[in-house]
């Protein structure tokens, strides 16, 4: 069986790793072994954080919706409950966008949600 020399392929592989490790600090951008190790970690972090990003955006949308809802005299969870009862299907991304960019439309949605809510049984009764 013929002997296979790997110098061309090995150098190409090392060059690709070092090229993708540009911008890393210290030896991690210059030495192949350290660069490869850091590159593997960075790919793992990128994979993990692409999935985590979705949850972070959802948290941001909920914070924005809650702040705008409280300006309309209703809490976030009551707003979502009212939207379900009123059968208004608007996702959190759109609600957050309305809260930031079109407050009048968001206020109208809040009023519709308030109207759909049942009377609060825990609210203090008005003196007769």
UniProtKB/Swiss-Prot annotation:
NCBIfam families: rplT_bact (TIGR01032). The keyword Acetylation does not apply. Transmembrane segments: none annotated. Keywords: Ribonucleoprotein, Ribosomal protein, RNA-binding, rRNA-binding. The keyword RNA-binding applies. InterPro entries: Ribosomal_bL20, RIBOSOMAL_L20_CS, Ribosomal_protein_bL20_C. This is Large ribosomal subunit protein bL20. Pfam families: Ribosomal_L20. Belongs to the bacterial ribosomal protein bL20 family. The lineage of its organism: Bacteria, Bacillati, Actinomycetota, Actinomycetes, Mycobacteriales. One of its GO terms (cellular component) is ribosome. GO terms for molecular function: rRNA binding; structural constituent of ribosome. HAMAP family: Ribosomal_bL20. One of its GO terms (biological process) is ribosomal large subunit assembly.
């Amino acid at each position: 069986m013929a002997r296979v020399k790997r110098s061309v392929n090995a150098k190409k592989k090392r060059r690709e790793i070092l090229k993708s490790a540009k911008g890393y600090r210290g030896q991690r951008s210059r030495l192949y072994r350290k660069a490869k190790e850091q590159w593997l970690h960075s790919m793992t972090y990128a994979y993990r954080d692409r999935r985590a990003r979705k949850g972070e955006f959802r948290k941001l949308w909920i914070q924005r919706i809650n702040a705008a809802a409280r300006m309309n005299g209703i809490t976030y969870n009551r707003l979502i409950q009212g939207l379900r009862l009123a059968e208004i299907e608007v996702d959190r991304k759109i609600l957050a966008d309305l809260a930031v960019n079109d407050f009048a439309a968001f206020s109208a949605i809040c009023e519709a949600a308030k109207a759909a809510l049942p009377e609060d049984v825990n609210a203090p009764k008005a003196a007769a």
